[in-house]
Amino acid sequence: MRKLSLILMVWLILMPVATVSLLAAGHLGFVSQEEFHWQGEMGVGKTLEIKGINGNIHAELSSNGRAEVLATKHGHRHDSKSVEIRVVEHGNGVTICAVYPSVSGRPNECVAGDGEGMNVHNNDVSVDFAVRLPAGVRFVGRTVNGQVQTSALSGEVAANTVNGNILISTSSYAQGGTVNGSVTASLGSFNWPHSVEFETVNGSITLELPAAASTQFEAETVNGNISTDFPLTVQGKLSPKHISGTIGGGGGRQLLLKTVNGSIELRRAH
């Protein structure tokens, strides 16, 4: 057994980094893992979009001025090779997708923007994305079963999932939503052009804005409370479950925070 373990260790060391498949002790069947790397130049104002189904997405600021993406695929009952990572370059930037096998007859495609949803059935492969962005690049992260998190970005952020938390930190502005999870966001700018929205169904919302924020504000919950650090000029009837009013001068912009089962907290940055 010791000799076999040594042989296995040497084999793993000599394997290319891109693909490693092995039989994991304590698990039934094969566990496979595979990595995908991409990097490229992206200018200020361009968008890097990540689309996944199962797995987490994490984005942070790049230290070398280049955009970099590491996608790590994990398979248990299904081979990680069954999920393809596709890169689509377009006029607005780059979209990178985890493309699962299709079972409905309509092939899954990697399309920029909202596009058509992918159909996935009975495939347990998860793909975790680790992203590094140059300053000023817009980030879009979309998944279904997983968390979307950004750390100290400097561009606009849009983050969406279904089953997972949203955690956003950017010196710009952002918006995001989930269904089963909480939303936590810290924004360094309130100069969004029209409106931004953060929403969930089963989870709380905590949003931090600059002290000088100026916006129309609306917050709504069913089972929870609403609190704000900002002085608020209330419009209409004041309710513990629904608040509509103005922060600062309003600025011609809108901010909507909405949940069903959870509380809402609007914080003022110090």
Stretches found by the model and what they are:
Residues 1-270:
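Intrinsically disordered, low-complexity terminal regions
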